[in-house]
């Protein structure tokens, strides 16, 4: 082969008789118009070209991004873990168990009540702050756990009026009491007072009810110049008259004014020669009760009425009758 015919261009491609021998240029010149349009749209829309099934570079970039995210998450998780490989950020927020309290007492006795981060490393699931609060509020042997006395409650209310909600400052006035205990007991006192005030509001006033009714009745018989109780002599039929006193107290429906009692007795004819003595009551309701007025009273009954009103009774020893 003639060495003059073989030449190299600036790109390192071999040429024969001045013609370029790489097919890419010829193929690019012979591309149809549809393919060139698709290339232009792919350049304008990078998302379409990236998601094209024949685009291998896009898939490679996506796999690199996924590996990068996983690597970042692993580094973050390792950063959150301590030297022992335990995730110290995950702490239980439930109630303290007796085993945890016993373990905390042992650790405080070993390291002292100040190295709380070191103590929390030996107590799984608890932070340093949680251990400190548990110790100073519940487990410290210097805490006074007895009930508050009346004198302490009085001083607590006075201190709250003076200092407000500064519980740490108020707790210094109560040796052995924590700020949390002082605050909780103040709320207990306020709740107790609220219940007592509500109970007093619900109680009815101490007045007589309008539906109350009191009836007092007494009966006696007047026989031959003396009064005899009906329970003592039920078989005696020679009674001249029988007097029955009824006191009734019923509330009226209208407004009232307080008055004194006024006793007004009348004798009304009853059955079988009985006379009924009724009393009108002007009570706290200030209105006279309805009563029965009987105008047909016999002569003997009128004499008994006159004797009763005059204050003495007529005794017929000779049996001649009243004159």
Swiss-Prot record:
Q: Which UniProt keywords apply?
A: Brassinosteroid signaling pathway, Cytoplasm, DNA-binding, Nucleus, Repeat, Transcription, Transcription regulation
> Null phenotype?
Smaller seeds and embryos associated with smaller contracted endothelial cells and reduced cell number in the outer integument layer of the seed coat during the seed development. Increased quiescent center (QC) cell divisions. Early flowering under long-day (LD) associated with FT accumulation.
As annotated, the DNA-binding region falls at 116-138, 167-190
Which compartment or compartments is the protein found in? Nucleus; Cytoplasm, Cytosol
Principal location class: nucleus
The record's induction entry says:
Levels follow a circadian cycle with a progressive decrease during the day time (at protein level). Down-regulated by brassinosteroids (BRs) in a dose- and time-dependent manner. Repressed by BES1. Auto-activation of expression. Targeted to 26S proteasomal degradation by the CULLIN3 (CUL3)-based E3 ligases CRL3(BPMs).
Question: Where does the record place Basic and acidic residues bias?
Answer: 1-14, 66-78
Q: Which PANTHER family match?
A: MYB DOMAIN PROTEIN 89-RELATED, MYB PROTEIN-RELATED
Instruction: Please state what the protein is called.
Output: Transcription factor MYB56
Q: Tell me the name of the encoding gene.
A: MYB56
């Amino acid at each position: 082969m003639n060495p003059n015919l073989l030449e190299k261009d600036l790109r390192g491609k071999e040429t024969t008789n001045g013609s370029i021998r790489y097919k890419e240029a010829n193929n690019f010149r012979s591309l149809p118009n549809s393919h060139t349009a698709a290339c232009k749209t792919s350049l304008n829309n990078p998302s379409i070209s990236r998601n094209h099934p024949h685009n291998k570079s896009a898939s490679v970039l996506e796999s690199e991004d996924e590996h990068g995210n996983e690597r970042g998450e692993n580094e973050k998780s390792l950063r959150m873990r301590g030297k022992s490989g335990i995730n110290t950020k995950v702490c239980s927020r439930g109630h303290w168990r007796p085993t945890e309290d016993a373990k905390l007492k042992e650790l405080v006795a070993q390291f002292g009540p100040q190295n709380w981060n070191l103590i929390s490393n030996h107590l799984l699931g608890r932070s340093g702050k949680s251990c400190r609060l548990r110790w100073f509020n519940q487990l410290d042997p210097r805490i006074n756990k007895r009930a508050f006395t009346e004198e302490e409650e009085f001083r607590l209310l006075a201190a709250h009026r003076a200092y407000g909600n500064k519980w740490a400052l108020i707790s210094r006035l109560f040796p052995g009491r924590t700020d949390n205990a002082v605050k909780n007991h103040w709320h207990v006192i306020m709740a107790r007072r609220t219940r007592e005030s509500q109970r007093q509001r619900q109680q009815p006033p101490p007045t007589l009810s309008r539906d109350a009714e009191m009836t007092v009745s007494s009966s006696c018989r007047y026989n031959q110049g003396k009064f005899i109780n009906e329970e003592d002599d039920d078989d005696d039929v020679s009674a001249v008259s029988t007097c029955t006193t009824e006191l009734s107290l019923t509330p009226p429906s209208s407004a009232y004014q307080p008055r004194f009692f006024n006793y007004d007795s009348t004798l009304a004819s009853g059955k079988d020669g009985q006379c009924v003595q009724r009393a009108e009551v002007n009570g706290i309701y200030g209105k006279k009760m309805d009563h029965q007025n009987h105008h047909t009273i016999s002569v003997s009954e009128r004499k008994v009425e006159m004797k009763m009103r005059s204050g003495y009774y007529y005794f017929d020893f000779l049996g001649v009758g009243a004159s």
